[in-house]
Amino acid sequence: MSYPYQKSHHQTQQPQQNGHPQHQLMLQQQQQADHSPHHHHHHHVHHATAHAYPYELGRSPLRSPQSPPLYSGKPPPPPPQSYHSYQQPPTAAHPPVSLSGAPTSMPGMMPGQQPPGMTLSLGGGGGGGGGGSAGDCFMLPPLQPQSPDGLSTVTNTSSTATNAPSARSVYPQHHQPSYPSIGSSHHPFHSPASAAALIGPSMPQHAQQQQQHQMQPHHYSSMHLLGPAGGPPSSVGPASMVGMMGPGGHGGGGVGGGAGGIAGGVGGGPGGGMGGGHNYSQSDDDSGCALEEYTWVPPGLRPDQVHLYFSAIPEDKVPYVNSIGERHRVRQLLQQLPPHDNEVRYCHSLTDEERKELKLFSAQRKREALGRGTVKQITTTLICERCGECASSGDMMVFASRFEPNTCWHPACFACCVCKELLVDLIYFHRENRLYCGRHHAETLKPRCSACDEIILADECTEAEGRAWHIKHFACFECDKQLGGQRYIMRDGKPYCLHCFDAMFAEYCDYCSEPIGVDQGQMSHDGQHWHATDQCFACSTCRCSLLGRPFLPRRGEIYCSIACSKGEPPTPSDEYAHRSSQPSHTAARSPEPLRSPERGTGRLSPPHTEHEVQSHEAASTVGSDRDHQLRSPASNGTATDNGTGTAGGGVGDSNRHRIPHRQPLDLTDLGHSLEQHWQSERTGSETISITTATATVRTQVTGPIAGANGNGPTGGGPILTSSMPELNRCLAAAGSGESPSFSGTNSPTPMPIEDSVVANGGDDADEQNQNASDASHSIKEVRFEGDFQDSLPRTKSYCQRNGGQRNRAAKSSSYASDDDELAEDETDNYHHRRHHHSHQREQQRPVDDSDARSVCSTCSSSSSSADDDVYELPLRRTSYGGTRIHYMPNNSLACARKRKQLQTSSGVAGQHYEKDNKNCIIS
């Protein structure tokens, strides 16, 4: 007959129990009195092991007067004396006992979940196995049950330190070997409130077994790892493992303690007495028992040795009650000792043949490899088997009977050689002189399925990525399609078919936004992905393919060059520099070329008939000649003169090229257009002589240069050029005696204009000689914006490096009145302008890297052309190799105003002004 547990807390038993048989009283007394440590060595096999979950021991299970007795309404008499401190520790001199039973751990148990009542099956052995039955079972209580009276619950099933007699101690327990275990009530009671509540009347053995198998199908303990008698003394199974679910889903007695399992230090060992919710708590009698602090302790140690042992283990792995270490221990029990490695009932879909093989496999492992470490305090110096360091006398070391006698480990070194985790509860497997946990030892013998985590007992399996699967389990993780012989992709250790992988993990192309399939090439950079095609993996600006080429990632885009990364095509300067580096020069079209506007005379050819006349340097014949590019609007390739005649043979026909229509640049620098000159930067400098008054500006071409350009030494024909379209408007009112101005290209291409020629169609030789006798003065520009004197509209002159690099025109400023005055002054006073360039001297002069200005900032005067034939600018070399570009205000009307003032001034003052200016040197 069975009696349900009552919710009472700590209870004692009386000899008379309201009609219950006397043998039940004796059973209760026997089972409660088995807690006394001086009886442990008689019944060490049957002691309950340490629990994996906290139990409060704030009160003694036998000293609670508030709790009524279990079977009687009589108040219990007070105990005759208080408890004494923990006395004689258990010894290791016990005969070997073989234990067998249920598995050790419960699959799927969460760390915070109360484990079920733990049922331990103990095989009949030297300690008395329950009257020769197949095995006696006992179940541990659940975690921390709460008593109705609000007092702390007490569960002390293994070792309460006391030697005092009590009302229950009428019959010595060592005279009753027929009662096999502590608290072996065999009833699947739900929530026992105290140690006394665990005691119940006995049941027939067959009823116990039947009820156990029917109502507790999942009970599991470490006893299943320890086979029947036949193993070595230390291979007796640990009595403390995970109990499984009891009836009603209530948690059982947690993960086992250290007492009663392995032979040698099992009997009477402190089996993990449960303390309060804090560490280092003390019981009511201030015994200082170390068992109250831990959920598991090594068997056979004194309290001081227990502290010494755990001090050698990392703090986060010490199984304090209600600590991280306790939860870690529970997890490691399930990890290191999988129940499906030993018990058929925890496996799925096994055939009869596989069931038999699993039983043989489990029994062989237990017989040949299973063992449990023994903790001892050494008295001599030994060397740790794992770390090789010496352990001095007094240190706690772990020994294993399956190894050599003096083989030992530090407590923190007693770990699995594969996973490097501490062997939970010191349970190890031996193979080839190495320590293994249960999981990895089984994997050394048979493969483990990566899907179901069970040992593969079949003859065939699927292996992929260095892992194994049951054939039916190797399937897509998403759609469960079997992948045997199919293509698959592993992701996070799980196989996927191609379709599911594309749907779940495919990247999207940054260019076309389409998914990149597993069969398509993929380019990736910094979290971005592209199809590995010329269309997708290309420069974001020019769309040139970047496959096999270095690329420039910028702002989430990829580019082929720095220019493209700035969002613009190569600049004209870059194009110019690139082309000028080539040995032969070709005519390059300017992005913004000039086009000479129509003159006021109306006798110019329309703009659509303009031609580009280029003088090319013959690299093989003319070594240092300059390149010339002249563009003049002409009809049928000839220049039209206004009134003095036409000369169309001034330009060689061989260097004349027709170009398409171009729009003029918006250039407004008019005032300095005839006097602003640039000197050569690299290969030579040009001497610029500017004469004013009645002198005309002419390009003197001699020697091979004239031959190259088609201009004879005497000037085959006057060619009027101007780099500024605004200059043509200034010269429009000059009358019929002035030649029209042809537009010279202000081109950033490799053929910039070097000479701006304004020629008169009359006598060329006289005008050349007239340069020395002109009474006008030449004004040279400087960077300053002061009151410099201008007497001419100025034209731009570009000096070109031998490398062909472009010089940008500098802009100067002058302040003027209006366009009409400028036109009138030009008509009255200036018919001709000449731009003099001495090419022979430039070949003999070093490179000038600076800007040549034509305005003196010191005296603001011009030199007289009557004194000098050519006013030559001295060279100046700077420390750097680049061109200095100065930008100035470009109001050209100021030039006309200042020129008018000079005309009205006295001739003497003008001559003095011109003479003062001739000695000014621009540097």
Curated annotation (Swiss-Prot):
Main location: membrane
UniProt feature, compositional bias: Acidic residues: 817-827
Keywords: Cell membrane, Developmental protein, LIM domain, Membrane, Metal-binding, Repeat, Zinc
GO BP terms in the entry: anterior/posterior axis specification; establishment of planar polarity; establishment of tissue polarity
Membrane topology: Peripheral membrane protein
Biased composition (Low complexity): 11-34, 59-73, 106-118, 152-169, 184-196, 853-865
Compositional bias per record (Basic and acidic residues), positions renumbered to this chain: 777-786, 840-852
Annotated gene: pk
Domain LIM zinc-binding span(s) in chain numbering: 382-446, 447-507, 508-570
Stated family: Belongs to the prickle / espinas / testin family.
Region: Disordered, residue numbers: 1-196, 571-668, 703-867
Domain PET stretches: 275-383
Superkingdom to which the source organism belongs: Eukaryota
Protein name, per record: Protein prickle
Compositionally biased tracts (Basic residues): 37-49
Native species: Anopheles gambiae
